[in-house]
């Protein structure tokens, strides 16, 4: 029985059933489609740099990208994510809030249907956002819907801390919901060199599980310790290979 419960097929099926059940009970969508990101990026009218061209070319692969600040890693990561479900992982709330604002400005209209922020103070961020939005007619209703879609991982793009998502590696009751969602998502890990040892440990373990479940991973960092690269690329039963590039 334990072998069945721990199998990837079981995790995905149970997780998707839980996700559908949550959505039906809350009268919400299971997923809000990402059909806007590539168009928003194209509207920037930028001439893409080498790092960005590399991510476009290798969009269907798992990536490890090392590059200094100012190379355009953010745009590169979003071009890799394309019009898919995206989780953008950063280590600090300040960095997450800044990335949330950056993506929100990129996608412009109806941001509350496109990009979410997920950390310990999500409610404060949203209340402040909606309070400053003069177009909102029913602030309480708008907040509840936005917050609910965020917590149930229904948003197209979610910028989050690793602890909000990768706690699923500890296999608490109902953990399959998150892992099943990751199985069809693009996971962007930014600045992995800044993670504390404990967070780094369970992040690497989560990455390996997500990879085995079918999710895609792209890691963008200024520096990468050799032991971290070894742990990330160490083969498990069906783990896909990474394309590594140092810019």
Language model segments and positions:
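N-terminal helicase ATP-binding lobe
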Residues: 1-247
């Amino acid at each position: 029985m334990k072998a069945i419960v721990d199998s990837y097929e079981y995790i995905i099926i149970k997780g998707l059933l839980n996700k559908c059940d949550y959505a039906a009970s809350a009268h919400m969508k299971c997923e809000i489609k990402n059909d806007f990101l590539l168009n928003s990026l194209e509207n920037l009218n930028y001439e893409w740099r080498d790092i960005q061209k590399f991510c476009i070319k290798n969009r269907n692969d798992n990536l490890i990208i090392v590059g200094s600040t100012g190379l355009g890693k953010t745009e590169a990561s979003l071009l890799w994510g394309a019009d898919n479900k995206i989780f953008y992982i950063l280590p600090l709330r300040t960095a997450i809030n800044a990335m949330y604002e950056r993506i929100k400005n990129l996608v412009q209209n109806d941001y509350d249907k496109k990009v979410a922020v997920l950390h310990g103070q999500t409610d404060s961020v949203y209340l402040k956002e909606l309070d400053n939005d003069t177009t909102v007619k029913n602030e309480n209703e708008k907040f509840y819907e936005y917050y609910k879609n965020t917590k149930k991982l229904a948003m197209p793009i979610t910028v989050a801390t690793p602890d909000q998502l990768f706690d699923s590696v500890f296999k608490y009751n109902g953990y399959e919901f998150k892992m099943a969602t990751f199985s069809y998502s693009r996971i962007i890990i930014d600045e992995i060199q800044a993670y504390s040892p404990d967070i780094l440990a369970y992040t690497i373990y989560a990455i390996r599980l997500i990879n085995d479940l079918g999710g895609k991973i792209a890691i963008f960092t200024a520096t990468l310790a050799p032991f971290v690269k070894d742990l990330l690329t160490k083969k498990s039963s069906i783990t896909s290979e990474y394309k590594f590039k140092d810019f």
